[in-house]
């Protein structure tokens, strides 16, 4: 029998979900294509799936498979060519003192409390603000690939030394990092934690000598997803080809909310 890491993508099966309400574009229905079985999707296979436009939620690996909509566009930053704009430089300057700790995916009560606070203030009524501990763990702490949790805290000597400000989940691929999900303290007015988190991940990707930071799906008509076009140069996947893309919103310099990767 072949070693697990040698199994080709042809060993996987793909099925389409039933239609469900789209969480990004109001009034639309969505479907996903899910890769199975989950136990065959190791780090190598998952890297190849991400390059084909897939993401994961817990142990479920999926990509958009909608009947009449193609709004969700896989995107990735070319980290070696990335240069921050003025607002991104300001976000870096404001938050570079945060202490980052990279750890395995582990349940921490403090993280869960921040997650609920973030959901209640940023996505109230969406259902995730009522997530149980089990739902939180299934969503963010279950993975069969090379995943990490990163927590950001106020540094020693600061007025709130040790205070948790942000938690981010990332996957390590063979050609880059993939941002899974980020949540942060929503009570700090004027903070740019989400922007800083992406900048931090870009730097980490560079330090690993890898070319890409995958940001999930860019959706032009979704305000909470359109921000991704601010990180240039951005590549998008169309058909089976990645190509450089500059979104109209980014080109016009329109402001966007601080990101939270989803």
Swiss-Prot record:
It is an enzyme of class 2 (transferase). It is found in: Cytoplasm. One of its GO terms (molecular function) is arginyl-tRNA--protein transferase activity. InterPro entries: Acyl_CoA_acyltransferase (IPR016181), Asp_Glu_LeuTrfase (IPR017138), N-end_Aminoacyl_Trfase (IPR030700), N-end_Aminoacyl_Trfase_C (IPR007472), N-end_Aminoacyl_Trfase_N (IPR007471). It catalyses: N-terminal L-glutamyl-[protein] + L-leucyl-tRNA(Leu) = N-terminal L-leucyl-L-glutamyl-[protein] + tRNA(Leu) + H(+); N-terminal L-aspartyl-[protein] + L-leucyl-tRNA(Leu) = N-terminal L-leucyl-L-aspartyl-[protein] + tRNA(Leu) + H(+). Its EC number is 2.3.2.29. GO terms for biological process: ubiquitin-dependent protein catabolic process via the N-end rule pathway. One of its GO terms (cellular component) is cytoplasm. Its main location: cytoplasm. Coiled coil: none annotated. Keywords: Acyltransferase, Cytoplasm, Transferase. NCBIfam families: PRK01305.1-1, PRK01305.1-3, PRK01305.2-3. Functions in the N-end rule pathway of protein degradation where it conjugates Leu from its aminoacyl-tRNA to the N-termini of proteins containing an N-terminal aspartate or glutamate. Belongs to the R-transferase family. Bpt subfamily. This is Aspartate/glutamate leucyltransferase. It comes from Cupriavidus metallidurans (strain ATCC 43123 / DSM 2839 / NBRC 102507 / CH34). The gene is bpt.
């Amino acid at each position: 029998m072949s070693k697990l890491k040698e199994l080709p993508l042809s060993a996987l099966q793909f099925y389409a979900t039933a239609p469900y309400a789209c969480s990004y574009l109001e009034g639309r229905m969505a479907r996903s294509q899910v890769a199975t079985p989950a136990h065959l999707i190791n780090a190598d296979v998952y890297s190849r799936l991400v390059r084909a436009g897939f993401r994961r939620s817990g142990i479920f690996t999926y990509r958009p498979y909608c009947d009449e909509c193609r709004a969700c566009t896989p995107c990735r930053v070319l980290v070696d060519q990335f240069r921050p704009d003025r607002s991104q430089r300001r976000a870096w300057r404001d938050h570079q003192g945060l202490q980052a700790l990279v750890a395995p995916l582990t349940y921490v009560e403090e993280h869960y409390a921040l997650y609920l606070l973030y959901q209640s203030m940023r996505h109230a009524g969406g259902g995730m603000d009522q997530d149980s501990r089990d739902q939180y763990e299934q969503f963010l702490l279950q993975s069969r690939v090379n995943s990490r949790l990163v927590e950001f805290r106020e540094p020693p000597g600061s007025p709130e030394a040790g205070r948790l400000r942000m938690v981010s989940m990332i996957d390590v691929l063979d050609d880059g990092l993939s941002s899974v999900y980020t949540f942060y303290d929503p009570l700090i007015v004027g903070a740019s934690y989400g922007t800083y988190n992406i900048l931090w991940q870009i730097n980490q990707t560079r330090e690993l000598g890898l070319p890409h930071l995958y940001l999930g799906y860019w959706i032009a008509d979704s305000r909470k997803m359109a921000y991704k076009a601010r990180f240039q140069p951005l590549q998008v996947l169309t058909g089976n080809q990645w190509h450089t893309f500059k979104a109209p919103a980014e080109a016009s310099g329109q402001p966007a909310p601080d990101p939270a990767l989803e």
